Amino acid sequence: MNKKPIILGIESSCDETAASIITENEQGMPTILSSIVSSQVDVHKEFGGVVPELAARSHMEKIDLITKKAFDKSGVKMEDLDAIAATAGPGLMVCLSVGLSFGKAMASSLNKPFIAVNHLEGHALSPKLNSELNYPYLLLLISGGHTQFLSVQGLGNYKRLGTTIDDAVGEAFDKTAKLLGIEFPGGPQIEVYAKKGDPNKYELPKPIFHKGGCNLSFAGLKTAVLKISKQIKTEQEKYDLAASFQKTIEEILYKKSKIAFEEFKKMNTINKNKFVVAGGVAANKRIREVLTNLCKEEEFEAIFPPINLCGDNAAMIAMVGLEKFKLKQFSELDSPAKPRWPLDADAAFLKGAGVRL
């Protein structure tokens, strides 16, 4: 019987310190043996956002303990590992360096292969941890730092169909939460507030809604929320603004996803089209519901990671490591951290005030 590979994943790109050990079952499906995530909410709460230097210090203080917990829960010994995978980017440079250095040191001391992982590729492959997923598929990556549509042709082969030209959708959620006085991290609480509000109370803008293909924009929406928030006097008005904001995001993602479906079908001729939605914002239940309904209308299969694997975690990093290990795609121990590391390196850089669509 062939030994199944055992991979350790390390994640420290922003404000979660995470370690995970995964393997495969007899059917070749990934199996999570352990997944430990330590959040830094209490560290950054008083500042209303992530402070890079404090985040890096917290990573350095916790990474040993978090990794030990991953080993303890999995029952795996260090010498049983087949490879160590660590996030190398994109993310905050000072934070990336902690996990990357830790992973390299482990690989060197154990004489095991090291695999530098693109954090975004981790999100892209995260649904493979709980479902069979073959290439190609359409990916909507929605998080605090990224919002983009990609045709996933294979491991390491991504074709960007559309992206935000300014802010990420997760950032818009976080900014709206802050304006409503919701304690950090407030983005996920918008959905809770929205349930108590009238989604038709405020008419909010949907930038580049009728142009730009499946590119997106959220800066104008954020500005509108800022203006309205200054006039709010009651809790109910906060709920109404949250509900109106949530509804606007749903409408934008519905419309732009529908356009992306057509672009994807032009590139790929397959029997069953699949639509993967991943990243922290994919945990939003209303967005899941709206995009699932769209998939039913357009005959796409909707695929989401489990809620606990939508945010940053190391299981998805180990998942990429597992795929790369099987292809013997190893990295050098001097692999650098990459604060910016697009999945589609050939795609034009769209972000910036000079973009005209």
Curated annotation (Swiss-Prot):
Its main location: cytoplasm. Binds 1 Fe(2+) ion per subunit. GO terms for cellular component: cytoplasm. It catalyses: L-threonylcarbamoyladenylate + adenosine(37) in tRNA = N(6)-L-threonylcarbamoyladenosine(37) in tRNA + AMP + H(+). It comes from the Bacteria. One of its GO terms (biological process) is tRNA threonylcarbamoyladenosine modification. Keywords: Acyltransferase, Cytoplasm, Iron, Metal-binding, Transferase, tRNA processing. InterPro entries: ATPase_NBD, Gcp-like_dom, KAE1/TsaD, Peptidase_M22_CS, TsaD. GO terms for molecular function: iron ion binding; N(6)-L-threonylcarbamoyladenine synthase activity. Its EC number is 2.3.1.234. Its cofactor is Fe(2+). Fe cation binds at residues 119, 123, 312. Substrate binds at residues 141-145, 174, 187, 284. It is an enzyme of class 2 (transferase). It is found in: Cytoplasm. Required for the formation of a threonylcarbamoyl group on adenosine at position 37 (t(6)A37) in tRNAs that read codons beginning with adenine. Is involved in the transfer of the threonylcarbamoyl moiety of threonylcarbamoyl-AMP (TC-AMP) to the N6 group of A37, together with TsaE and TsaB. TsaD likely plays a direct catalytic role in this reaction. Belongs to the KAE1 / TsaD family. This is tRNA N6-adenosine threonylcarbamoyltransferase. It comes from Pelagibacter ubique (strain HTCC1062). The lineage of its organism: Bacteria, Pseudomonadati, Pseudomonadota, Alphaproteobacteria, Candidatus Pelagibacterales.
